Amino acid sequence: MAEEQPQVELFVKAGSDGAKIGNCPFSQRLFMVLWLKGVTFNVTTVDTKRRTETVQKLCPGGQLPFLLYGTEVHTDTNKIEEFLEAVLCPPRYPKLAALNPESNTSGLDIFAKFSAYIKNSNPALNDNLEKGLLKALKVLDNYLTSPLPEEVDETSAEDEGISQRKFLDGNELTLADCNLLPKLHIVQVVCKKYRGFTIPEAFRGVHRYLSNAYAREEFASTCPDDEEIELAYEQVARALK
């Protein structure tokens, strides 16, 4: 007889109405992990302005997101992810860790470059900061278009050319994608709204990656509304003057 699964509940930041999902890439990351694991779980949005007594008791002063697994409360996104990968394991649940270590780090500096770009109010610095963001996106594009070791046929003398894989580590979503995609989504939405900047079409690997990601329910259905992201960055994005 199969072992009964403990109750799993993810507490995430609520949006501006106090109910729908708010802008938080860490919350979306864990939402995606749980969905990909195929585990039964609940998601509870927490209005940060009015934390309920239940939430305060479970995680007094705790940062969102946090996880309730049975009676255990888990905090810290990285630790929660490690915990879920360890307890929700094969054969019952899929392993989500990337095979290639580079998949975990590729594109990770994009968000820092984006933050510097969007927070800058000095027009004289704008071009250089935009170039920094483009450079980081190009590094990701190069990784996505370069074949992974498992895509290379060592018996063939022909050049393997451009990788056609769907995601960072292959054709399935992994923990690496759960980490990067929510941040890339924010970059797209905020840069378009506050800088009129879009990811260049020349970055075909990045566009293919995002197109494949938006076709997956685990990503598309866990994204907050664009308006929530724009609102979260209203005070952060500095006008150039």
Curated annotation (Swiss-Prot):
It is a single-pass membrane protein. The chain crosses the membrane at residues 26-46. The keyword Transport applies. Gene3D superfamilies: 1.20.1050.10, Glutaredoxin. It comes from the Eukaryota. GO terms for biological process: chloride transport; positive regulation of osteoblast differentiation; regulation of mitochondrial membrane potential. InterPro entries: CLIC (IPR002946), CLIC-1_C (IPR030259), CLIC_N (IPR053823), Glutathione-S-Trfase_C-like (IPR010987), Glutathione-S-Trfase_C_sf (IPR036282), Glutathione_S-Trfase (IPR040079), Thioredoxin-like_sf (IPR036249). Keywords: Acetylation, Cell membrane, Chloride, Chloride channel, Cytoplasm, Disulfide bond, Endoplasmic reticulum, Ion channel, Ion transport, Membrane, Nucleus, Oxidoreductase, Phosphoprotein, Transmembrane, Transmembrane helix, Transport, Voltage-gated channel. The modification N-acetylalanine is found at A2. Expressed in neonatal and adult cardiomyocytes (at protein level). Residues 93-233 form the GST C-terminal domain. Residues 2-90 are annotated as: Required for insertion into the membrane. In the soluble state, catalyzes glutaredoxin-like thiol disulfide exchange reactions with reduced glutathione as electron donor. Reduces selenite and dehydroascorbate and may act as an antioxidant during oxidative stress response. Can insert into membranes and form voltage-dependent multi-ion conductive channels. Membrane insertion seems to be redox-regulated and may occur only under oxidizing conditions. Involved in regulation of the cell cycle. The active G-site contains a monothiol Cys-X-X-Ser motif which mediates glutathione-dependent redox catalysis. Members of this family may change from a globular, soluble state to a state where the N-terminal domain is inserted into the membrane and functions as a channel. The redox status of the active cysteine in Cys-X-X-Cys/Ser motif likely determines the capacity to adopt a soluble or membrane-inserted state. A conformation change of the N-terminal domain is thought to expose hydrophobic surfaces that trigger membrane insertion. This is Chloride intracellular channel protein 1.
